[in-house]
Amino acid sequence: SGKYIKLKTLNSKTLSYKDTKVLVGTKYTYKVRARKKAGSGYIYSSYSKAVSTTQKLSKPGLTLKTTKGKQILSWKKVSGASGYYLYQKKGNGSFKQIKKCSSKTTKYTVKTKKGTTYSYKLVPYRVINKKLKNGPASSVKSRKAK
């Protein structure tokens, strides 16, 4: 419903463009057209068919470090995330959410019981129009507690 703006003028040898200023969860629609120098101005082709896309959250990388009596989880910030859900599974149980972290959080320490295997996964989320949208979960990290 918004209007189109010119992002960039590219030379004839450039066949792609990366829009680096997009916001996660926002729909963007793009069109292109060719131009040719004609005297002191340009001749323009018709616009291409519109193509739409919505930027999604990236899959987070999760690191697990085990020390005596605790496990330390750390990750890099996911661009556009409003925060993270941290899930834990003990042994063969099922995953349960153990923490909801802010977007500024990149580390969390969990107390553990020696000999128990713990598994973790991290899910980024973004609040869009007062609704939570989850991104892809990290790979599961598992380790036996010391």
Labelled PLM ranges:
Residues V24, S40-G80, K130-K146:
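Pro/Thr/Ser/Gly-rich low-complexity, intrinsically disordered linker/stalk tracts
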